[in-house]
């Protein structure tokens, strides 16, 4: 949602080349997936903004089977408008439908249980079996839900708008507010649900926060469209001290960072909307690196950009989503940990995130 205007502008530029390069994959199976498979890769397909065509694609690696619209095939209804993220708490899945103002609650077999009304939901952060936080675009609040009773139980006021990425560490939830005037992240005491502290970061507009193997926070900030260059800040959550700062080139637009399974290497996407190779592809850095890499680990082709990134827990394989301009079905590419491409398959429109289940 936050970058939809940029994606719309670039659609015309990419359209002709995207259609020419589109490859139909032959491994898509019938309409009803086998939800009893233990190893699953859920592909969160945003759809195109305002069209209500988001989808949940499902890949079963052990069967090499792809279901492009698993939710619709099981529930006989559309998912909603802009599928932003999903997570599992207990035996239920929670799906954030950003532009539908809903969090869908699914049973273990992917049947719809109910939905919660939350304005512009972005991400769900599990606190415990009876509490989770939901961030909310265009709002200065984090919403509290009970995953056991499927109810909205409260809200937490933040000082700024656009609550976005969240992380849990040592009884505190660290919250990003993707506001261009903000150079802080905020901590919430998860026992009292009260705003407790804030830490200054090295850039503006914090959007994502991760916790590495040494229990340090990594905050990704920036909003290139609004003139705020991107930066990484590594912070000690005990003292609030800034340990390292990394500043990206002016045109670099990093998004969707993830840690590897040992939490000692960060992977992220850089997006070049102009169709060039500079600052475009999958990048990675060790938590002990002294500088950012100038070259991508997995480069994007000319007039291509990536939008989804995830690392599978069992294999360590790297999953990358190509939205193909959000004007047709997207694709997912799978790479080994050393960057060798081993698989590509078609998914629904706009792959934006992955959720792995083992």
Q: Residues of each region from the PLM?
A:
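Repeated scaffold domains used in trafficking and secretory/extracellular systems
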Residues: 80-85, 120-127, 161-168, 204-212, ...
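Surface loop/turn motifs at the tips and blade-to-blade linkers of beta-strand repeat domains
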Residues: 72-79, 114-119, 155-160, 198-203, ...
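Acidic/polar, low-complexity intrinsically disordered N-terminal segments immediately downstream
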Residues: 25-107, 139, 323, 328-329, ...
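Bacterial Sec-dependent N-terminal signal peptides
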Residues: 1-41
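Short loop/turn segments that connect beta-strands within beta-propeller blades
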Residues: 61-63, 107-111, 146-150, 189-194, ...
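Conserved beta-strand positions in repeat-built beta-propeller and related beta-rich domains
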Residues: 43-51, 95-99, 134-138, 175-180, ...
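Structural motif
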Residues: 50-58, 102-105, 141-143, 181-186, ...
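Short coil/turn segments that connect the beta-strands within blades of beta-propeller domains
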Residues: 37-39, 90-92, 129-130, 170-171, ...
């Amino acid at each position: 949602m936050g970058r939809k205007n940029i994606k719309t502008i670039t659609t015309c530029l990419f359209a002709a080349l995207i259609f020419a390069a589109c490859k139909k994959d032959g491994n898509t199976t019938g309409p009803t997936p086998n939800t009893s498979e233990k190893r699953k890769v859920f592909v969160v397909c945003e759809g195109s903004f305002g069209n209500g065509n988001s989808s949940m694609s499902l890949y079963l690696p052990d069967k090499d089977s792809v279901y492009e619209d698993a939710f619709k095939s099981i529930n006989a209804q559309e998912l909603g408008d802009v599928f932003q993220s999903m997570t599992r708490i207990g035996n239920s899945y929670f799906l954030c439908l950003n532009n539908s103002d809903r969090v869908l609650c699914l049973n273990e077999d992917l049947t719809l249980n109910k939905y919660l009304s939350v304005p512009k939901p972005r991400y769900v952060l599990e606190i415990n079996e009876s509490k989770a936080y939901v961030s909310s675009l265009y709002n200065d609040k984090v919403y509290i839900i009970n995953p056991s009773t499927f109810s909205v139980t409260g809200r937490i006021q933040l000082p700024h708008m656009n609550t976005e990425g969240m992380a849990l560490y040592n009884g505190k939830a660290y919250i990003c507010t993707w506001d261009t005037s903000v150079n802080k992240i905020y901590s919430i005491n998860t026992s009292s649900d009260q705003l407790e502290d804030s830490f200054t970061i090295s850039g503006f507009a914090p959007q994502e926060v991760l916790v590495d193997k040494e229990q340090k926070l990594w905050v990704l900030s920036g909003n290139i469209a609004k003139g705020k260059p991107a930066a990484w800040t590594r912070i000690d959550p005990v003292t609030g001290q800034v340990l390292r700062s990394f500043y990206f080139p002016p045109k670099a637009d990093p998004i969707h960072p993830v840690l590897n399974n040992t939490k000692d290497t960060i992977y992220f996407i850089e997006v070049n909307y102009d169709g060039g190779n500079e600052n475009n592809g999958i990048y990675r850095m060790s938590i002990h690196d002294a500088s950012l890499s100038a070259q991508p680990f997995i480069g994007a082709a000319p007039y291509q950009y990536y939008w989804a990134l995830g690392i599978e827990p069992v294999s360590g394989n790297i999953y990358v989503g190509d939205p193909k301009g959000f004007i047709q079905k997207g694709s997912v590419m799978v790479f080994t940990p050393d960057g060798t491409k081993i698989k590509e398959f078609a998914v629904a429109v706009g792959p934006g995130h992955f959720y792995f289940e083992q």
